[in-house]
Regions:
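Long, contiguous, secondary-structure-rich segments that constitute the structural scaffold
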Residues: 11, 15-144
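C-terminal accessory/binding modules appended to enzymatic or scaffolding proteins
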Residues: 1-15
C-alpha cells in the first residue's frame, strides 16, 4: 500500500526537513506490523529491501501496530535514486514507484489504479549504499 505523504506534494518537497520525518538513514520509511517484523527477524530502524517482480528499493523500517498484519506501507514521493548493488540495480532511497503497479484502470477512464502490490521485505545484509540524491550537482563551467 502506498498512500500520499502529508509532508510533501507527490515528489515535490522531498528535499525539505519535514519530508524526512521518520526516515532511516535518509531512506523513506516502510511501515510494518510488529508481528510481521518479528517473523522476519526485523526491528525498528533496520534498512530493508522491499522487492517484487517489478523492482526493488531500500527503505528504513518503522514498526507500528497501526499497520495491519500482512500489509506494509511506503508513502509516495521519495526521489528515485537507482544504484548498482549486490542485489542488482535498485532504488536506494525508497521510491514506491519502483514496486507499484503501473497500469491504467481502463481504456476509457485511463485513471490510475490503487498503489498496491505483493512485495517481500527482508533485512539488507550488504553494505548500505549512501543516499546522494540531495547532494548538489557538480558545478561545470561553460565553455567560452
Amino acid at each position: 500500500m502506498s498512500p500520499k505523504s502529508r509532508y510533501r506534494m507527490h515528489s515535490q518537497l522531498d528535499n525539505v526537513n519535514t519530508a524526512r520525518r521518520g526516515s532511516v538513514e535518509e531512506r523513506e520509511p516502510v511501515w510494518m506490523n510488529p508481528a510481521d517484523a518479528q517473523v522476519r527477524g526485523l526491528k525498528n530502524g533496520d534498512v530493508v529491501l522491499v522487492k517484487c517482480r517489478r523492482g526493488a528499493c531500500l527503505c528504513g523500517l518503522q514498526v507500528s501496530d497501526r499497520i495491519k498484519p500482512g500489509v506494509v506501507s511506503i508513502q509516495h514521493g521519495a526521489w528515485f535514486e537507482p544504484e548498482n548493488t549486490p542485489a542488482g540495480r535498485i532504488d536506494v532511497h525508497g521510491n514506491a514507484n519502483t514496486i507499484a503497479i503501473d497500469v491504467i484502470t481502463s481504456k476509457i477512464a485511463r485513471g490510475n489504479v490503487s498503489s498496491t502490490g505483493n512485495v517481500e521485505v527482508s533485512l539488507w545484509k550488504d553494505e548500505v549504499p549512501p543516499v546522494r540524491i540531495f547532494n548538489q550537482p557538480r558545478r561545470v563551467n561553460a565553455v567560452k
